[in-house]
Amino acid sequence: MKYKVVSTDHRNTRIEIDPPQRIVSLVPSQTELLFDLGLDDRVVGITKFCVRPEKWKKTKAVIGGTKNFHFDVIESLHPDLIIGNKEENYEEGIVRLEEFFPVWMSDIVEFQQALDMIRSISLLTQTERKGAAIIDTIEKRFKRLYQFPPLRALYLMWRNPWMGAANGTFINTIIKRTGLINVLEDEMRYPELSASKIKELDPRVVFLSSEPFPFNPKYLQEVQDILPRAKILLVDGEMFSWYGSRLLHAPAYFRKLREMLGIV
């Protein structure tokens, strides 16, 4: 007897579908989760920004970007489940997809919401045991995470204009879990920042993220000139902003960051 899988997503939208066999993922961090859940044979489409696992760029259909879907490609794949995210995708595109396909959307700011997403997707895809194991390991590794001293930190994720990660973001949640103080805690989302504002914030540590703006060593001095006393570090943006199974690797990465800051 055929049965349905039922799930309510983070928008409180309920979907009831046959166990999915043709999945399209619209978000890089959730694409990696699908791989870690062992769904290689059931994922048929990903975005051009879905870089993990690397081999999927060669074996899966690329359906465009996270904010510009190629609807003809998606339609040709005949998906029975599309998985997206409120922040990373665009409402107009999601509404259009929902006219034809089941769409499950995440909306993640808090740590527990990330774990809930992993649990929900594992239930939808009948990989509950693997999902539970991933969640259990993430929780254990974060519980063992040594906290940073309460240093004032600024996380920059864009240049020209400068933009930082403030309250109401998953990045802010991760910064706080490390023990650091986000100097943009009183702001919301991703505020634009002038050089004078950055000086006024007076962070002790500045993280230059690898994404979405690809900060590299040539930008270190530019920020150092604004904040001569601060420690400026290039960081892997995936470790701060990816809310899927990449969280398995974040605690070990933060230990390395402690060493880079000279914190034993």
Predicted regions and their residues:
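N-terminal ligand-binding lobe of clamshell/alpha-beta domains
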Residues: 1-264
